[in-house]
Amino acid sequence: AASMAACGARANVAVVSGGSVPKLYMNARDHVKKDVKALENCIGSFALLITPDDGQTPVIRLDSLGKHTVGAGAAPQAITSALTFEPLQKAGLKMTDVDKYAPELHNAEITLPAGAGNVPEANYKMIAALSVMKGQIERADIPKFVAERGMPGFVPTQGHIPSGVPYIGHALEALKAGTIKRAMIIGKGSLFLGRLTNLADGASFIMEGPGAGTEPAQGVSQSDVTEMLLAALSDVAANLQKG
């Protein structure tokens, strides 16, 4: 969607997604066993409007998109590296240059009683551990990294709704207000794909404030071109005389 808007193929692109009815009360059996109320009683959905860069709205960087390729492997460390470290490295950024990471933002109140753990916290710890491996933070700074660059999970467990996408609205407000400079939105994992192929899918992108990471174009005047041509011709003439 962002690529179509950026290249001018489409002026406005709407990205709309809804939850899955069959996944209502998906973990209810475990909740009931533990005498916990079945909380999965809502369907999550979201919609985004992608437009060309107007210089005033936060942007999606298209030069550093993350993707989980088949060759990356299915190990959690490999997936995390493909979706965070590699695209940041491509953009010349460090893991600490991202103010907020938004991975799978499952609501822990639902997943903990179901035995799935605190999914967002596990993701943040993995990202922090990868930062330690790359020498970008110290091991003792892992809790601080998680606290400052993470967030509690708040999203219904509805298919791919609990990715990082629901944070986009909050990120837009924070980027406009200047409270953060950069956020990374991460989506990964597919239960059905994983069951069928033992592989996972994933993608990520970086959001930045208006004008961030861009430099004004340097205009070249006619006189500049003339001077460069004259200098080049002088060099050619000098070489011919030497010959």
Predicted segments with their positions:
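Active-site-adjacent helical/loop segments in soluble small-molecule enzymes
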Residues: 146-155, 159-163
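Active-site-adjacent elements of ketosynthase-type condensing enzymes
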Residues: 21-31, 165-168
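Acidic, glycine-rich active-site loops and adjacent beta-strand->loop/helix elements
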Residues: 17-26, 187-192
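Short acidic/glycine-rich loop or secondary-structure boundary segments that cap or lie
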Residues: 108-114, 194
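Transmembrane beta-barrel domains of bacterial outer-membrane proteins
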Residues: 118-125, 145
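Active-site-proximal alpha-helical scaffold in enzymes
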Residues: 1-15, 19, 50, 158-179
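Long, low-complexity C-terminal extensions of enzymes
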Residues: 169, 173-203, 212
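Condensing-enzyme catalytic core mediating Claisen C-C bond formation in acyl metabolism
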Residues: 29-103, 109, 126-138, 147-150, ...
